[in-house]
Amino acid sequence: HLATTAQNDCAVTSQALQNAYSDAFDTWVRASHLRFGPTEVDDRAFALAFWPDSRGATPRSLTTLLTEKDPVIASPEDYAQVSIAARGFYAMEFLMYDETLSNMGDEDDEDDRCTLVQTVTKDIATTSAAILEGWQTDYAARLKSPDTSSTYRSDEEVLQELFKALVTGLQFTSETRLGRPLGTFERPRPTRAEAWRSGRSARH
């Protein structure tokens, strides 16, 4: 839905695009703690959600692509080879909501940004489809039917994997999603919150 919307309306101020982005991001966040199996192949989880980005790799990578008018901007097939920081939902957030990147340049730059939005959303769709296919064609069956010759040898090992994912997800929320922006009493750091530019932090 996000990629389709972007093909029809790639303006970063488009309400339809913003709504589709938020819906797609919500879908990912609900499953983002399941960091095993298909999400870990080819760093797919990072390709969808490269955060935290303490060194500013995402805006730097996107700025380079746009200022150098890199041909990869118009090539969804090749875009999977760019820096992982320039991919996924946080790259889209910068393109849509960052004051500098969303307003950068002249009319030609606006066309490039529009094309990049379309390419990033197609890349998100491709990565998401690969994860879904991995679950549907193979990995779900491994969890449901453990076997001594399979990834999971018993129901107990399946439960351990799921419990580990849950605990790790809760720790990430506590230490990173909440801990980073809270900082200290004397020095809170709200701009370290996840997805603060799009006003989504509390949804995560």
Q: Where are the language model's segments positioned?
A:
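Mature extracytoplasmic or organellar-lumen-exposed domains after removal of signal/transit peptides
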Residues: 1-204
